[in-house]
Amino acid sequence: MGRIVDFNDKVFYKYHKMEIVNTIIREYKEADDARRKELIDNVAVAFNINTIAIYDRTELTKHILYGDQRMTDDDGSFFKEDNYIPNFREDGIFVIDNINYFETKAPAVYKVYSEYGIVQAVQYIIGGDIKKNNNIISYGRYKLDKKWAESDMNFLAIIGDYIGRVFLKERKHD
């Protein structure tokens, strides 16, 4: 007889998050608006996220995918200030574990995010290369949580890259 495996919470949530990534990739592009909303909601819950937004830095627009709709007045112009973009890692990921650290390092980002109550964020350059793409997806939290796990950052980058490419491609065709 087989032995029942006792997964601890950490292992369970890691595999649960992988399933969310897989589901996004399998379903998002062909899904209707209601299903897309459900998929985005699943991402937010699994990763303890309060806001998800795509910044189109070419058009200086922000598209809220999840969270507070009043945040649309932020156009992402803060990305051009404080020499912010070079802080992204080579893989296109940038992590804010505590927004207070940026009060002097990147005051424009600090001002925008603190006004909305965002204290932690993971940002990803859609496509992974700032030289080829001006679009960024940002995931924000309103409460300080533990530091972002490396696996979570990578999962969010994969999700953000896929959703971002689909979203922006569809906007260009509208």
Task: Show which residues each predicted segment covers.
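Signal-transmission linkers at sensory-effector interfaces
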Residues: 1-34, 172-174
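Amphipathic alpha-helical coiled-coil segments that mediate homodimerization
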Residues: 20-47, 54, 159
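GAF sensory/regulatory domain recognition
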Residues: 41-44, 53-77, 85
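Long, hydrophobic, amphipathic alpha-helical segments used as structural scaffolds
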Residues: 51, 58, 167-171
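Regulatory sensory and allosteric helical modules in signal-transduction proteins
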Residues: 73-122
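A short, hydrophobic, proline-anchored segment that marks a local hinge/packing element in signaling
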Residues: 120-132
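Short beta-strand-to-loop transition segments that serve as allosteric relay/switch motifs
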Residues: 135-147
